[in-house]
Amino acid sequence: MEGNSKVSVDNKLRAVVKRTVENVGELEKAFSDKPDALKVYKEIISKEKDAESVWKIITDKKFKHKEVNYELLAYLVKEKFIDIRMFGSAFAVGGFTKAYTGPIQLNWGYSFNKVELIDSSTIVTIMNDGSSTFGKDYRVHYSLLGFNGTINAPAARSTGLTNKDLSVFRNAIWESIPASPTRSKLNQYPKLYLEIVYNEGVSNGQFGDLRNFVEATPKGGITDKQVRRFKDLDIDLDLLKKLIKENKGSDKKIKEVIIKTSVDFNFSL
């Protein structure tokens, strides 16, 4: 973000490439095992007056050394762009046209408990002319949402995703929602994060969508429409625990299980 506007991936690439060509040490690091590629860039830099001029040359359609650009792009993704290492992106800049498939893929969430939609009118601001209008705002009394995702090992090697990146991701996905001040995130809190790490040679997603092993039912004799808080639900994770226990071990599919829980929720294997 710059100010109140989003920075496109192409503009971000442009800024980082320009900073890199201005820094000889960084450029040499990028091409540490590619001396011929480094030579191409240094020859261009020696002839041009500034980084903007270098950028125009290496992104020109007539530039004959596009493979050198891809070497630089691979370095920048692995060293500078943690978001692309996680979720991938497509670059559409001349000389840098390439798509990276993100190792981390998340599905849409759905509610474990039945909900009743409550529609209400809300004021929607039209940003371009400063005016406002009324729109529909759909809410529910309470919903326990579940999300499923995968981390693909081959794609992770392609983008350079590291174990440190994964640690950042786990903390971010756990802490970001309650930290968000937006109206749509109000009163949303994580209860359980569970990640299955497979043994070497076992492809991810072996057990399908793990949400299929979770059941949530109203307790205390109340109906679905009367659910108002987390404590109103009975969460049955027995099938999930059974799945993990039967498949965990050095000679089985599961290597380890990473778990985070809220203070008001207990889950252990």
Regions from the PLM with identified roles:
Residues 1-269:
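RNA-binding basic/glycine-rich loop and surface signature characteristic of RAMP-family CRISPR effectors
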